[in-house]
Each structure stands twice: as structure tokens, then as C-alpha cells.
Regions:
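Extracellular low-complexity, O-glycosylation-prone stalks/linkers
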Residues: 1-264
Length: 264
């Protein structure tokens, strides 16, 4: 029963935990705790206890932090099958801790004790978005970094970019008039981009197979106002996304028809 709870066990574990430390276990009387942690991934387990024993644990993954106000800039470039990460230290900790991977289930960790400001990483695959984090720490032995590390910088990186595997989804045509229409779409999902999405290209084809000039839009745009359409004409819109590697497949809208009469 909740009224018989004597306290809580709170375990926090860094991901990845390459030192194979047991999680930090904290005993709490209250149902809140303030942690000063880095932007690394953390796994939290919480259980309650009373005179009869301990409850099952509730598992929680600390969500990703915004990395807009970090002090350092990280740069990544290819070198053969590896990537070289460089940064300019603004202070001199005893070591840097580097995390890299595609997500919390696929993170690697390395402790760097030299003050060179660069490091070579491996284990990269093409067409996958990697997150690279550099943390400064005054503790460099194989022990918990939770109380000691501060994030210096975070960046995202594709070892090799590809073209998007799909086009935008849910392309819809709204507000159709004699000479205009509004096109809306859902952005290409991150896992389908296979590279940094640079933008979209949109054009339309009429019933005579006459194609308009393509308009290039930035990657944050998810709507476009078509103008210069002919009245009483059937059109289809086509949209594709593109990365640094090129343009992906087209998504075609359902046909729509402009009216003969009505507003312009």
C-alpha cells in the first residue's frame, strides 16, 4: 500500500557504461531528486520499499537534451574508413569522454587523457545518422562520470550520405481555385533520409503531360502555394526530397481539378 511506503531506491546508470560499474543507488524519502548530469544517455530505475520489501522497478530513459547552449564546437571529417573528431578545448580538464552512436541502444564510449583536441572514431556505417558527444571530466579512472562530467559539445554526422529512400508522405491539395491551390505534406522521416535533408523540389503536371518548372524549397517547409494554374484543368503535384548525395524518389499527389468558375 502506498501509505506504508518508507522510501524509494533510485538507480541512475550512464549509457554506455563501458566501465561496467554498478548503477549509483540513492535512497530517497521524497519523490523528487535533482541531478546535475551531462547530455549523455542515462537509464533510471525507481522502486519503492516498505517493511515487507522492495517493489518492482520502473524503468525510465532520460530524454535527449537540447544542445543549443553548449560551450564548444565539434568538427568531424572523413579519414579512410574512420572519422576524425576535432575540437578546441576552452578549459583543461583531466580528460575528455567521447560518446558516439546512432542512439541509446548503440553507443560507444572512449576516455581521452591526452590534450590533443582530436580523436579518431570507428564503427561507422553508411547512411546512418550518428550523434557524437564530447564531455569534459576531472575523473578519468573507470568510475562513475555522473557527478563529474560536463558536456563540451554535441554534433550529428553521416559517415556517408545517400539519397532519400522515400518522398514526402500524405501529400494533400487544399483551397483549390481557378488558378491556384495549396499543397501540404509530411516531412520525410529521419530514418528514411539517409543523409542531411537539404530541401524539397516540387512541380506539377497537367492532363496534357505538360510539366512545370521545379521549385526548390528548404527542408523545414511542408506547404507550398501553387499559382498560375489553368481553369478547368486536371493536375498532379510531384514532390521529392534531396540530400548532398542527390534527389530521392517522387511522391505524386492525387489528381485535382481546377474549377471553371469561382474565385481566382
Amino acid at each position: 500500500q502506498s501509505e506504508n511506503i518508507l522510501g524509494y531506491f533510485f538507480n541512475v546508470e550512464r549509457i554506455p557504461n563501458s566501465c561496467s560499474d554498478s548503477p549509483n543507488r540513492i535512497f530517497l524519502k521524497d519523490r523528487k531528486i535533482l541531478l546535475n548530469i551531462s547530455t549523455a544517455y542515462y537509464r533510471v530505475n525507481i522502486s519503492a520499499y516498505n517493511e515487507a520489501g522492495e517493489s518492482p522497478q520502473a524503468l525510465y530513459i532520460v530524454p535527449e537534451f537540447s544542445a543549443t547552449d553548449l560551450p564548444g564546437q565539434i568538427h568531424v571529417k572523413h579519414q579512410g574508413t574512420n572519422a576524425v573528431v576535432t575540437w578546441t578545448p576552452e578549459f583543461n580538464p583531466k580528460c575528455f569522454v567521447v560518446d558516439w552512436g546512432t542512439g541509446k541502444e548503440d553507443m560507444h564510449m572512449k576516455i581521452i587523457t591526452t590534450a590533443t583536441g582530436n580523436f579518431m572514431l570507428d564503427n561507422f556505417q553508411p547512411y546512418k545518422l550518428y550523434k557524437i558527444m564530447v564531455h569534459a571530466s576531472d575523473v578519468c579512472q573507470c568510475e562513475s562520470f555522473i557527478r563529474h562530467e560536463k558536456t563540451f559539445g554535441v554534433t550529428r554526422f553521416y559517415f556517408m550520405e545517400g539519397v532519400p529512400r522515400t518522398g514526402p508522405t500524405n501529400v494533400t491539395i487544399l483551397n483549390i481555385t481557378k488558378h491556384s491551390a495549396l499543397v501540404k505534406w509530411n516531412e520525410i522521416a529521419v530514418e528514411d533520409r539517409l543523409g542531411f535533408l537539404r530541401g524539397y523540389r516540387i512541380s506539377y503536371i497537367d492532363s496534357a503531360r505538360k510539366k512545370s518548372l521545379a521549385v526548390t524549397l528548404n527542408s523545414s517547409t511542408t506547404s507550398y502555394h501553387l499559382t498560375g494554374l489553368k481553369e478547368k484543368t486536371i493536375y498532379r503535384v510531384q514532390i521529392s526530397g534531396f540530400t548532398g548525395a542527390g534527389e530521392g524518389p517522387l511522391t505524386l499527389s492525387q489528381p485535382f481539378s481546377t474549377p471553371k468558375y469561382g474565385t481566382v
